[in-house]
Structure formats: structure tokens, C-alpha cells
């Protein structure tokens, strides 16, 4: 029985070792970026076109590889979005905007935490310090979207030999025209289709609970299947060994009966001799 239990435990540990790498290979920050980034289009449509958003921008971001500026930009985007969130917090008409910005802040904060928690070999410091500039909502969220896209490919985007050097021919005026590259396409969004989010705090709590539940499910399911497969192997091994165990028990019982018969016969002979 001890051998059977040892075999079952061994199967369980083997399955855990086999399945755990599958959970880890989903990416270091695989689920940091959620579908809430799709609401950027609504937010840009809601904000005045001449509204200005302050952002510390890395000079040469349009020409440098993404690994040269991604860590700095996610930090600066977090600061700017948090400031923007504070401006909408006390405006009842802007509850829908507040909810969208709040979700974007959470995404960017998670990306900042990821860049601080893991050492990416390809990520380098920006060649120049970020400069404070004012951007329209369309320009600002184009930078936001580009940073999100760059972060998704952060682990494979650049080689170690890539240089983070801004060309001397790049003028500040040319670099500041962010709207020239990658036009931001805005589908028509009717104001009546935007629903005021009067329960943003409840949604934040439910979203955080949902995210944690998904993470626990991702961890628990492989472990559960590992246990099931381990027990299945153990049961097959036990079933295979069961006939041998039954024969062993029967042999022991037969030997005990033979010994008892021999003892009785011996005592009977001794009694007859007396």
C-alpha cells in the first residue's frame, strides 16, 4: 500500500510540474491590457477638440524604437491620466468620461508596475529627458495607443544592439507634430449613445474582483486537471497491482492455515506419545 501511495503522489507532482509552465508562458504581463482601451474613441469624441492635455513627452519618440521610450512614457501617461481624472471627478455631466479615464489609469498603472517588477533586457533609458508639452485629446491618445501597442510587443520588439540615438537633423518642430503619423480614425459617435456611468465605483470594484477571479481560475484549473490526471494514473497503477495484492493476501492466509494445521498435528502426536 505504501508503494501505491508513493506512486500516486509522484504522479501528482509530475503533473503539477508539467502544467505549471503552461501558466507562466502566457506572458509576463499578459493580461495587463484589457478591452477597456477600446473606449478611447468614445473619450476622444466626448472631449473638446481644442482641449489641451499636459504630458511629458520623450523627444524623438516618433523615430526611436519603442524599447527606448516605453518605460518612461507609461510613467508619464499615468501622471497625465491621473490629472485628467481629477478634473472630471466632481463633474456630474462627465461621469461617463470619468469611468473611461479611470479604467485607462488602472491599465497604465499596471503597466508601470510591470516595468518596475521585471527586468526587460531590451528596454533602455530615453536619450533625452521628457519635455512637458500640451496635446489635443486626439494627439494625446494616439501616443497612448502607440504606447499600449509597443508594450504588447515589448518582449520581442528590439534587439540588444538597437541604438537609442536621435538624429541631429530632427528639429523640435518636426518632432512635435505627432498628428502627422498614423492618423487617428474616429467613427461617428452620437452623444445620445453615451450612457452616464452613475455607478463607476461599483464597476471598479466588480472589475477588480473579476480580474482576480480570472487570475485564480487560470491558476486553479491547471492544478485541478493535474490532480485529476494524477489520481487517474494512481488508480490505474492500483488496479494493475490489485490482483498481485489479492494473491499475496491469499497466500498469507493459506500459509497461516497450514501452520495452524501443522501445530495441531504436532500437539496431537505429543499427546498420543504421552
Swiss-Prot record:
Membrane-topology descriptor: Single-pass type I membrane protein
How is the protein modified post-translationally, according to the record?
A soluble form is produced by proteolytic processing of the extracellular domain.
InterPro entries referenced in this protein's UniProt entry, alphabetically: 4_helix_cytokine-like_core, SCF
Q: Which residues are glycosylated?
A: 90, 97, 145, 196
Q: Which terms are listed as keywords in the entry?
A: Cell adhesion, Cell membrane, Cell projection, Cytoplasm, Cytoskeleton, Disulfide bond, Glycoprotein, Growth factor, Membrane, Secreted, Signal, Transmembrane, Transmembrane helix
Which molecular-function annotations from GO does this UniProt entry contain?
cytokine activity; growth factor activity; stem cell factor receptor binding
Q: Which residues lie on this side of the membrane: Extracellular?
A: 26-215
Q: Where in the cell is it found?
A: Cytoplasm; Cytoplasm, Cytoskeleton; Cell membrane; Cell projection, Lamellipodium
Segments crossing the lipid bilayer: 216-238
Please explain the role this protein plays, according to its UniProt record.
Answer: Stimulates the proliferation of mast cells. Able to augment the proliferation of both myeloid and lymphoid hematopoietic progenitors in bone marrow culture. Also mediates cell-cell adhesion. Acts synergistically with other cytokines, probably interleukins.
Protein name per its UniProtKB record: Kit ligand
Q: What taxonomic ancestry is recorded?
A: Eukaryota, Metazoa, Chordata, Craniata, Vertebrata
Amino acid at each position: 500500500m505504501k508503494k501505491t501511495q508513493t506512486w500516486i503522489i509522484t504522479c501528482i507532482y509530475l503533473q503539477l510540474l508539467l502544467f505549471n509552465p503552461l501558466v507562466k508562458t502566457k506572458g509576463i504581463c499578459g493580461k495587463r491590457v484589457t478591452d477597456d482601451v477600446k473606449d478611447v474613441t468614445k473619450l476622444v469624441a466626448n472631449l473638446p477638440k481644442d482641449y489641451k492635455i499636459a504630458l511629458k513627452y520623450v523627444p524623438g519618440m516618433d523615430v526611436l524604437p519603442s524599447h527606448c521610450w516605453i518605460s518612461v512614457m507609461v510613467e508619464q501617461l499615468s501622471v497625465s491620466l491621473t490629472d485628467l481624472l481629477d478634473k472630471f471627478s466632481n463633474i456630474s455631466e462627465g461621469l461617463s468620461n470619468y469611468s473611461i479615464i479611470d479604467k485607462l489609469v488602472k491599465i497604465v498603472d499596471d503597466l508601470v508596475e510591470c516595468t518596475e517588477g521585471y527586468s526587460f533586457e531590451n528596454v533602455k533609458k530615453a536619450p533625452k529627458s521628457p519635455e512637458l508639452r500640451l496635446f489635443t485629446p486626439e494627439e494625446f491618445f494616439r501616443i497612448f495607443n502607440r504606447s499600449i501597442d509597443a508594450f504588447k510587443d515589448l518582449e520581442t520588439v528590439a534587439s540588444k544592439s538597437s541604438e537609442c540615438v536621435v538624429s541631429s537633423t530632427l528639429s523640435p518642430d518636426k518632432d512635435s507634430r505627432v498628428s502627422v503619423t498614423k492618423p487617428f480614425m474616429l467613427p461617428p459617435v452620437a452623444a445620445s449613445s453615451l450612457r452616464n456611468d452613475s455607478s463607476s465605483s461599483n464597476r471598479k470594484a466588480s472589475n477588480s474582483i473579476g480580474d482576480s477571479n480570472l487570475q485564480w481560475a487560470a491558476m486553479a484549473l491547471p492544478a485541478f486537471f493535474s490532480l485529476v490526471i494524477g489520481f487517474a494514473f494512481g488508480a490505474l497503477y492500483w488496479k494493475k497491482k490489485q490482483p498481485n495484492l489479492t494473491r499475496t493476501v491469499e497466500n498469507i492466509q493459506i500459509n497461516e492455515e497450514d501452520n495452524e494445521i501443522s501445530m495441531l498435528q504436532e500437539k496431537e502426536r505429543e499427546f498420543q506419545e504421552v
